[in-house]
C-alpha cells in the first residue's frame, strides 16, 4: 500500500504519475486557439482551447477499453426464436393440407423466409440502442383540428379512469393495515383490474357510452388504438406508483388529472398505422408534411410505436419516433482521455494530457440576466394588494398580466434551449475526439441544499445548467460512439495541489490555485481536473505506473 504524504488521496503513486503529466501554469495570458471541431455557432457558448504543443508522455500506458460482447445473448435469442419459427412453420404445413384454398410450397417457403429475415433483424438490434428522434410536423388546419380532438378525448378518458381508481384507493386505504395490504387489494380488485387487457375490455364500452357523454362529446373521433394506448399509459403510471408504495419508497401518491390547457400534450400511435406519407390516412388524409421531408424522412420507415406531442408555447406539433442507433466505429485519431471538472462559473474545464479546454465561460452572466428578468416579471404579477384588486380586474389589466406570464415562459424556454444545445454539442464534441471520458459525480442537488455555502443565484444557475442531465446525455452518446464513460468521485481535488499534493485549506472561491508549498500557480479548474485523473488513475492506467 502506498504511503500517504499530503492530500486525502495523494500518495507516492500520485506523485509518480503527476511527474509524467503536462501541468500547465496560469493560462490566462495564453492565446486560445480556434474552435477545433466544436460545431456550435451560439455566441453564448464559449469554447477556448489552450495548448503548448507538448506531446503526450510515452510512459503513460492506458488500459484497453472494455468492449460489450453480445454473442451469448444473441445465440440464446436466436435459438429461442428459431425454435418458435420452426414450430410455426411445421404447423403451417400441416394445417395447409386441410385448407380449402391451399397455399403453394413456394408461398409457404416465402412466408418462412420472411419470418427468418425478421428474426435476423431482431438479433442485429442487440448491437444497437433505442433513441428517439423528434420530427416537426406541418399539419394543415383540418389535421390540427383532428389532433386537438384526439388530445381532448384522451384527456377525458384518462381523467375519468383516474377518478374511478381514486375512489377505490380511498376505500381500500381505510381497510388496509399497511401499504403492502393496500397494494394487494388494489391489484386484485376485479371491479377495476390493473391489467391492460382486462381493463381495456371492461371499460371500452363505458368510455364510448358514459365518459364522453359527460363532456358533451356525442361521437367518438379518436381511434381505438389511441384509446388503448391511453389506458396503457394510465395502467403503467399506476403500477409504477404501487410498486414504490409496496417497497415503502413513498408513503402515498397524489392523483393528478391531465390539464386540457397543458403546455405539453401527448398521444401514442402504433407503428402499424403509419402509411407511406402519413398515419391514419383515412382520418388525417394521405399526406402529412414534416419539416424533415427534405432531409429524407419517410413515414414508411417508422418501425416502432411513437408519440405525437403538441407544444402549446411554440404552437408546434412534433412526432417523437424511436429508432435503433448503432455504434459509430469509424472515427480515428482520438485522444486517449479527457478529464472534466464541472462548475458554475465555467460549465466544463477539460484536461486532455496535452491541452486544456474551457466550455461555457460566460454562462453565469447569460443565465442570471434571464433569471433576474423572470424575477422582475413575477414581482409585477405578485404586487402587494393585487389579490384584492384582481376581483375587479379590467380587460386591460388581464391582458397585461397574461403578457407577463408569456414573457416568463419565454425566458424559461430560452434558458432551456441554451442548456439543451450546450449539453448535446459538448457531448458530441467529446465523443468524437476522445476514447475515454472521465466525469465527476457533481450533484447540483447537493450543492443547492441549505447546508451549502453558495448564494441563491449560484444555486439557481446550477439548477438550470443541470450537470446531472448532462451526464445522462453524455452517457448515451458514449454508447453510440463507443467511448468509455467513467463517473468518479471528485472529493478533495480542488484543494489539493496537483504538483506536490499540498492541501490549500484557505483556497476559498479563488479562481487561481497558488500553492504555498511548491509556489506554482495554475487555474483552479485545471488543477482540479488533473487531480481527478490522479485520484482515479487506476481505472484507466496500467498497474505498473
From Swiss-Prot:
Residues annotated as transmembrane: none
The organism's place on the tree of life at top rank: Viruses
Keyword match Cell membrane: no
Molecular function via GO: DNA binding; metal ion binding
A Gene Ontology BP annotation from the UniProt entry: transposition
Keywords, sorted A to Z: DNA recombination, DNA-binding, Metal-binding, Transposition, Zinc
Residues that coordinate or bind Zn(2+): 497, 500, 515, 518
One Pfam family recorded for the sequence: Cas12f1-like_TNB
Stated family: Belongs to the transposase 35 family.
UniProt-recorded name of the protein: Putative transposase R104
Originating organism: Acanthamoeba polyphaga mimivirus
Amino acid at each position: 500500500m502506498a504511503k500517504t504524504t499530503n492530500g486525502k488521496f495523494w500518495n507516492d503513486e500520485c506523485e509518480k504519475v503527476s511527474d509524467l503529466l503536462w501541468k500547465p501554469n496560469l493560462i490566462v495570458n495564453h492565446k486560445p486557439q480556434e474552435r477545433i471541431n466544436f460545431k456550435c455557432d451560439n455566441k453564448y457558448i464559449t469554447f477556448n482551447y489552450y495548448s503548448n504543443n507538448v506531446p503526450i508522455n510515452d510512459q503513460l500506458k492506458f488500459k484497453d477499453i472494455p468492449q460489450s460482447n453480445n454473442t451469448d445473448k444473441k445465440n440464446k435469442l436466436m435459438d429461442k426464436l428459431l425454435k418458435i419459427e420452426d414450430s410455426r412453420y411445421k404447423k403451417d404445413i400441416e394445417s395447409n393440407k386441410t385448407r380449402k384454398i391451399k397455399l403453394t410450397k413456394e408461398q409457404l417457403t416465402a412466408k418462412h423466409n420472411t419470418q427468418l429475415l425478421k428474426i435476423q433483424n431482431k438479433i442485429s438490434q442487440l448491437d444497437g440502442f433505442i433513441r428517439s428522434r423528434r420530427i416537426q410536423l406541418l399539419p394543415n388546419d383540418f389535421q390540427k383540428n383532428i389532433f386537438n380532438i384526439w388530445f381532448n378525448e384522451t384527456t377525458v378518458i384518462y381523467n375519468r379512469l383516474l377518478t374511478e381508481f381514486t375512489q377505490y384507493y380511498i376505500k381500500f386505504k381505510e381497510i388496509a393495515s399497511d401499504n403492502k395490504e393496500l397494494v394487494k387489494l388494489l391489484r386484485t380488485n376485479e371491479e377495476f383490474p390493473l391489467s391492460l387487457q382486462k381493463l381495456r375490455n371492461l371499460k371500452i364500452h363505458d368510455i364510448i357510452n358514459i365518459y364522453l357523454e359527460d363532456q358533451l362529446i356525442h361521437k367518438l373521433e379518436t381511434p381505438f388504438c389511441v384509446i388503448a394506448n391511453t389506458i396503457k399509459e394510465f395502467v403503467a403510471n399506476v403500477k409504477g406508483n404501487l410498486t414504490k408504495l409496496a417497497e415503502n419508497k413513498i408513503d402515498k401518491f397524489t392523483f393528478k388529472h391531465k390539464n386540457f390547457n397543458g403546455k405539453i400534450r401527448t398521444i401514442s400511435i402504433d407503428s402499424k398505422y403509419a402509411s407511406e406519407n402519413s398515419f391514419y390516412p383515412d382520418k388525417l388524409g394521405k399526406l402529412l408534411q414534416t419539416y424533415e421531408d427534405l432531409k429524407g424522412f419517410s413515414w414508411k420507415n417508422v418501425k416502432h410505436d411513437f408519440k405525437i406531442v403538441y407544444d402549446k408555447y411554440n404552437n408546434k406539433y412534433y412526432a417523437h419516433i424511436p429508432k435503433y442507433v448503432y455504434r459509430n466505429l469509424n472515427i480515428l485519431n482520438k485522444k486517449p482521455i479527457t478529464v472534466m471538472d464541472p462548475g458554475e462559473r465555467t460549465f466544463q474545464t477539460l484536461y486532455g494530457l496535452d491541452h486544456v479546454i474551457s466550455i461555457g465561460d460566460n454562462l453565469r452572466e447569460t443565465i442570471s440576466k434571464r433569471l433576474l428578468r423572470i424575477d422582475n416579471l413575477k414581482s409585477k404579477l405578485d404586487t402587494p394588494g393585487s389579490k384584492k384588486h384582481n376581483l375587479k380586474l379590467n380587460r386591460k389589466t388581464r391582458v397585461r398580466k397574461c403578457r407577463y406570464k408569456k414573457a416568463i415562459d419565454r425566458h424559461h424556454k430560452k434558458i432551456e434551449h441554451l442548456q439543451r444545445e450546450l449539453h448535446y454539442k459538448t457531448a458530441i464534441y467529446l465523443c468524437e475526439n476522445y476514447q475515454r471520458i472521465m466525469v465527476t459525480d457533481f450533484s447540483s442537488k447537493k450543492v443547492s441544499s441549505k447546508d451549502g455555502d453558495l448564494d441563491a443565484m449560484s444555486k439557481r444557475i446550477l439548477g438550470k445548467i443541470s450537470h446531472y442531465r448532462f451526464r445522462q446525455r453524455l452517457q448515451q452518446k458514449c454508447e453510440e460512439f463507443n467511448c468509455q464513460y467513467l463517473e468518479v468521485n471528485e472529493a478533495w481535488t480542488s484543494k489539493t495541489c496537483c504538483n506536490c499534493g499540498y492541501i490549500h485549506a484557505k483556497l476559498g472561491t479563488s479562481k487561481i490555485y497558488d500553492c504555498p508549498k511548491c509556489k506554482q500557480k495554475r487555474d483552479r479548474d485545471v488543477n482540479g481536473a488533473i487531480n481527478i485523473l490522479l485520484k482515479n488513475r487506476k481505472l484507466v492506467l496500467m498497474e505498473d505506473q
